[in-house]
Amino acid sequence: MSKAVKILLVNGPNLNLLGRREPGHYGHHTLAQIVEQLKLLAGEQGASLDHIQSNAEHELIDAIHQSDADFIIINPAAFTHTSVALRDALLGVAIPFIEVHLSNVHAREAFRHHSYFSDKAVGVICGLGEQGYRYALDSAIARVRAAQEK
């Protein structure tokens, strides 16, 4: 029997404002509501989900460094376009990850089109709202289970 799958969900700056910040781009649910639903979905699949949200880059880096997760789902938010340090943290721990964005970053301002993460991510999901997190969770669990069966 395969071991339980551990997922780390990392959310970057300003995502604590979900539900009130630009709901046209980011939706009406709070981050707490989204995370609660993801934890339930993970549990239904025999997986666990830990979560961190921070507006401080070093806190996200520390959480990644300390993680024993099998897979990371990350919405780096504004750090997408600026953080070599967060990229290096992900590469340093060598935990596979999926990059998620609630809005379609390619349909927004030009500065949002560049990501320091996309070229190293297993996959990138953007523009699908909170459903993107669910797709990432399903994919992460499936990928870990497939690797465990090898």
From Swiss-Prot:
Binding-site residues, substrate: 75, 81, 88, 102-103, 112
Keywords annotated in UniProt: Amino-acid biosynthesis, Aromatic amino acid biosynthesis, Lyase
Catalytic reactions of this protein: 3-dehydroquinate = 3-dehydroshikimate + H2O
Record's keyword annotation contains Amino-acid biosynthesis: yes
Stated role: Catalyzes a trans-dehydration via an enolate intermediate.
Residues annotated as the enzyme's active site: 26 (proton acceptor), 101 (proton donor)
One GO MF term: 3-dehydroquinate dehydratase activity
Subunit structure as annotated in this protein's UniProt entry: Homododecamer.
Record has Amino-acid biosynthesis as a keyword: yes
EC category name: lyase
CDD domains for this protein: DHQase_II
Entry EC no(s): 4.2.1.10
Domain of life: Bacteria
Family membership noted in the UniProt record: Belongs to the type-II 3-dehydroquinase family.
A Gene Ontology BP annotation from the UniProt entry: amino acid biosynthetic process
Disulfide bridge map: none
PANTHER family tied to this protein: CATABOLIC 3-DEHYDROQUINASE
Protein's name in the database: 3-dehydroquinate dehydratase
Annotated positions for site Transition state stabilizer: 21
Pathway(s) served: Metabolic intermediate biosynthesis; chorismate biosynthesis; chorismate from D-erythrose 4-phosphate and phosphoenolpyruvate: step 3/7
